[in-house]
């Protein structure tokens, strides 16, 4: 699976979906995250929890054995597609810059996406978990 910022934030903040997301990650042998997503999470966590948050994030990524994937040309093309078709101000999904990294890695790798919220449900990406 590919893991979006929203899922990691939910886990680190112990939100109601945290256990479902943690179990989904643990049960999947493929755990991917775009370097762009990792940067987005780092920016959010640093703003909220300073260096302690960064350490918590890095420890979680290590313990969960999440593989960080470099952003390549194929992902660039898919991210452009994502924004053109589902981007904020263009489509109800309103994907932002960071969302485009997760979308593109999910589509180019053929892996489902783990996310929280309703943005990706309005796209053609496959969800790793359905939260009601």
Residue spans of the language-model regions?
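Short, well-structured N-terminal submotif of metal-dependent ribonuclease cores
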Residues: 1-33, 46-59
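Histidine- and aromatic-rich ligand-binding microenvironments
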Residues: 4, 33-34, 95-96, 117, ...
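A generic structural signal for short hydrophobic patches within well-formed alpha-helices
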Residues: 8-9, 38, 120-121
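A general structural signal for well-ordered alpha-helical segments in protein cores
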Residues: 18, 38, 54, 76-79
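Short loop->beta-strand "edge-of-pocket" segments that line small-molecule binding or catalytic clefts
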Residues: 30-32, 64-69
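Active-site neighborhoods of divalent-metal-dependent phosphate/nucleic-acid chemistry enzymes
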Residues: 68-112
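Acidic, PIN/NYN-like endoribonuclease modules and their adjacent C-terminal/linker elements
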Residues: 103, 107-132
């Amino acid at each position: 699976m590919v893991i979006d910022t929203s899922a990691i934030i939910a886990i680190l903040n112990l939100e109601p979906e945290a256990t479902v997301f943690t179990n989904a990650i643990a049960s999947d042998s493929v755990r991917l995250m775009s370097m762009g997503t990792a940067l987005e999470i780092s920016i959010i966590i640093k703003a909220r929890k300073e260096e302690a948050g960064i350490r918590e994030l890095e420890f979680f990524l290590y313990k969960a054995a999440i593989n960080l994937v470099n952003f390549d040309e194929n992902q660039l093309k898919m991210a452009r597609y994502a924004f053109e078709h589902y981007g904020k101000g263009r489509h109800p999904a309103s994907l932002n810059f960071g969302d485009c990294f997760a979308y593109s890695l999910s589509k180019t790798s053929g892996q489902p996406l783990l996310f929280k919220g309703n943005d990706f449900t309005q796209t053609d990406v496959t969800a790793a978990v359905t939260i009601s």
